[in-house]
């Protein structure tokens, strides 16, 4: 074990020396403390002295002003323009697993577009017996399904590949959301058109926005769990999430989830579009390219404590919480380390639903006030174990961007303030 460190890195040996010294004289405290009379309890407050807001004041419910900081945020220097850019879900401030549409990250290639349901058309062509054009009402007539799935951008955590970069879990891991979608299985629409559904065929799905964003999907996946969705979390899709209709490709990278879908073409082979050649592929140091890397491997991150969620209560009882997910299926276990990966404790998993959806995990523990190096490590039902960053670098080199599912480390100091670091 080395004492070397670079950038925001730290060594496990140096950390253990500091933690032992910091925690030597700390006494633990209970979750609640006895105190003198609190005027918020003993005195009548303004909100109990006048009538509140009527039922018609806010026809569509909005968050209260005291939660106005729980919003999507972008990194201004990341892209040249917000029109072709991305912002980040405030996962540090959310609980459970369902992401409100208004908090769910956005990724656009030419900006979000406005389209009325009445103007919506979806064409299915190519290797089909009868090319069809559906309007919005047509799609709603087919048998529908409801499923909860996560959507993760392939570049989520991509800026962290070279080292600890951004000091906030919203920015390191916030290119993800998890919503309940209502839609029609893609296979239903393909059957309606008499498509050639041989497993050696592909479908090419194209969006209606100015970028004409499109991706090729193997027929085997298209016939499995892909949805043509028109609702999210029980309501119409928001504009930024593809209103009125988008594609849902469970477990696969977010670029496949085409928004405002206008055309589905059945083809003999992959189209090799811009988004699957010059984009969303990675070139190794030996010149070979890594492509068709659709599935998002098992990943987890601690959301609290984290740089945007300091420990405010001091030593004593605490809950370490986070999120885990896998594009291969379901999370079966999450381990948490408080010493940078030297020792691990198994976390408690929240109630699970659909596969390929977020899982909430908790470690109910005690904090003695000493510094911590917090990590989470996820496992899924295929037996896959979330790797360290060094393991990913050994496999893919130093210049990766996409599919970074490495273990994340937060350094928590004696004051409860967290920082993004990399351990070696």
Regions flagged by a language model, labelled:
Residues 36-424:
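Structured, non-membrane catalytic/scaffold regions adjacent to prosthetic-group chemistry
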Residues 20:
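Short, locally clustered residues in the helix-turn-helix/winged-helix DNA-binding domain
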Residues 1-14, 23, 29, 35:
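N-terminal secretory signal peptides
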